[in-house]
């Protein structure tokens, strides 16, 4: 996993805006690596951090973290060797047994991801 950033701050902001727009208006976008094939995992996490910052500025509440690509088969399919970590906000979570409008989704489907809702903030190095 590369810890080197290859994207400029401007690229990170622009890609974040693209992801945010797609999420807000529920439309599909091409993979970010289609435009930036040299994009590193660190770049991806930088885009995610900018998205998290924007959501929190819009009064989303950070409630936990989720892990994706947790199976070996999915990691191989996606060309990575470690799971990915993402954030979970109150606006992403749904109460148990609640209805979800499919019009709010791009490609409606169920996908198992491990998520952690924490009672207190996690603290530590990195």
For the regions a language model picked out, list residue spans one by one.
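Active-site microenvironments in enzyme catalytic cores
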Residues: 2-126
């Amino acid at each position: 996993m590369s810890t080197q950033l290859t994207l400029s701050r401007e690229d990170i902001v622009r890609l974040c805006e693209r992801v945010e727009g797609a999420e807000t208006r529920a439309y599909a976008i091409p993979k970010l690596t289609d435009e930036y094939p040299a994009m590193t995992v660190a770049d991806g996490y930088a885009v995610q951090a900018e998205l998290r910052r924007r959501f929190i500025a819009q009064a989303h509440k950070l409630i936990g973290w989720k892990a994706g690509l947790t199976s070996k088969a999915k990691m191989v399919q996606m060309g990575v060797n470690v799971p990915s970590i993402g954030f979970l906000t109150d606006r992403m979570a749904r109460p148990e047994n609640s209805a979800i409008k499919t019009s709010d989704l791009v490609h409606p489907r169920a996908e198992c991801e491990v998520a952690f809702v924490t009672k207190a903030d996690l603290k530590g190095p990195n």
